[in-house]
Regions:
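C-terminal SET catalytic tail plus cysteine-rich post-SET Zn-binding segment of SAM-dependent SET-domain
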Residues: 2-30, 34, 147-291, 300
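Catalytic cores of histone-lysine modification enzymes
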Residues: 4-158, 199
Length: 305
């Protein structure tokens, strides 16, 4: 409903809204679909939302029928309880069917119901040792980032902004990969495949899936794979503060300790340079780094009574 209101508010009238939709639907290049006239994809513009994928052709009849019924109910409420179309409709469905503006909005509601499950992001805040979901948000710009079961970035929020930080070395020209809630270290590949097909309608072909990487408990420690004793010693020295940082992160004692981010990043770089990734250690360092990023961001705090 908020998306519909935003669309009408931005366009000022249904005629302009129709013009926008026609331009987006007829756009040939999928890479720039939804971009504004200044050649930018704005998070706060409706046309950016309208250009997002729906996967209509991949959805089941049952799925589309349910969303269609929901759209009809929402449209009926809008028409009979508000003056969004200029006046309140009487409780008469035939009047809706013959109104071209009502048909337009009903179609958009149906489209948005297909856009949302494929494109929204949940945002969480640290609460104790876990994260609490605070809501979901539709950010067209973030939909440009593809998924990997072994992502190289992490998302967290600071104030009213979403921040994306690297958690693995990223070379110039390499792609940034987010994670859609399906990490190879905790979810086996067959289950990830099932989840992706059910919600996103695609088969993941990331490096973790192509290599069929084992979960965390099946990974090797670096000492099991490295024969050179001097390299082993160097890695052990680099990781000497790992347990200490893990304890500080667990107890939420990372305030004014930004140096920990730098040291953990160095650990990750050394492991990448000398250990066949992934390893148990690199997963451990990355998880601690993610925890610290979460703690320096927004936190969910319940006041003590």
């Amino acid at each position: 409903m908020r998306i519909i209101i935003q669309a009408i508010k931005e366009s000022k009238n249904f005629r302009t809204l129709r013009k926008w939709i026609k331009q987006i639907d007829e756009w040939k290049d999928p890479r720039t679909k939804g971009f504004s006239s200044d050649k930018k994809l704005h998070n706060d513009k409706y046309i950016s939302v309208h250009g997002l994928t729906t996967n209509t052709e991949k959805r089941s009849i049952c799925d589309l029928f349910r969303r269609s019924v929901d759209s009809c109910v929402l449209l009926y409420i809008l028409a009979t309880r508000t003056t969004i179309f200029g006046y309140k409709f009487k409780y008469n469905l035939s009047a809706l069917i013959s109104n071209k503006d009502a048909i337009l909005i009903g179609g958009l509601i149906l489209r948005h119901q297909q856009i949302i499950p494929n494109n929204v992001y949940s945002f969480t805040e640290e609460y104790g040792l876990d994260g609490r979901e605070r809501g979901i948000v539709l950010m067209p710009f973030y939909s440009l980032f593809n998924h990997s079961c072994n992502p190289n970035v992490v998302r967290y929020s600071i104030s009213k902004k979403v921040v994306m930080s690297a958690i693995h070395p990223i070379k110039k020209g390499e792609q940034l990969f987010d994670n859609y809630g399906q990490h190879y270290a905790i979810i086996e590949q067959s289950k990830r495949k099932e989840n992706f097909l059910q919600q996103y309608y695609f088969l993941c072909k990331c490096t973790a899936c192509r290599s069929d990487l084992p979960r965390y408990d099946g990974l090797y420690c670096f000492e099991e794979t490295i024969q050179n004793n001097s390299v082993k010693l160097m890695i052990k020295t680099a990781l000497k503060n790992l347990e200490k940082y893990a304890s500080l992160a667990m107890m939420d004692k990372v305030k004014n300790k930004e140096f920990m981010i730098q040291e953990l990043s160095k650990m990750i770089q050394i492991l990448h340079d000398h250990v066949s990734t992934p390893s148990k250690e690199i997963n451990e360092v990355v998880e601690i780094l993610k925890r610290i990023y979460g703690l320096i961001g927004n936190k969910f705090v319940l006041p003590k009574i």
